[in-house]
Regions:
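Short S/T/G/P-rich N-terminal loop/turn motif that feeds into the first structured element of a domain
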Residues: 1-34, 39-41, 46, 50, ...
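Short alpha-helix boundary/capping motifs
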Residues: 23, 57-58
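An amphipathic, aromatic/His-enriched active-site/gating alpha helix that lines ligand/cofactor pockets
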Residues: 58-84
Length: 95
């Protein structure tokens, strides 16, 4: 499964309340994604809540686009990414 970063813009800001309603909204997205083999790993949200950078595992960018459409979420840019972990290099020095 490939990993992707999805950039989304919310002109009015994204507000997900820390309530049961907010949890249900998130779990609805998770459920719809799962039907398409897409896993939402986590998201970064800008301070003004108008932009998110979401990390996903998915079979393809098209699967993410389809999930976004079903969830009525924007998906302006989808980029394949890989982890660059500085601690990996520290461990390599020890070997």
């Amino acid at each position: 499964m490939a990993r992707f970063m999805v950039e989304r813009t919310f002109p009015d800001g994204l507000e997900i309340p820390p309530t049961e309603q907010g949890a249900q909204a998130c779990m609805s997205v998770v459920g719809t994604n799962a039907e398409l083999g897409v896993t939402w790993v986590h998201s970064y949200v800008t301070e003004d809540h108008k932009k998110t950078f979401c990390i996903y595992d998915a079979p393809s960018p098209d699967a993410i686009r389809n999930a976004a459409k079903l969830n009525q979420l924007p998906a302006e840019k989808i980029t394949a990414v890989r982890v660059l972990d500085p601690y990996f290099y520290l461990a390599a020095e020890v070997r």
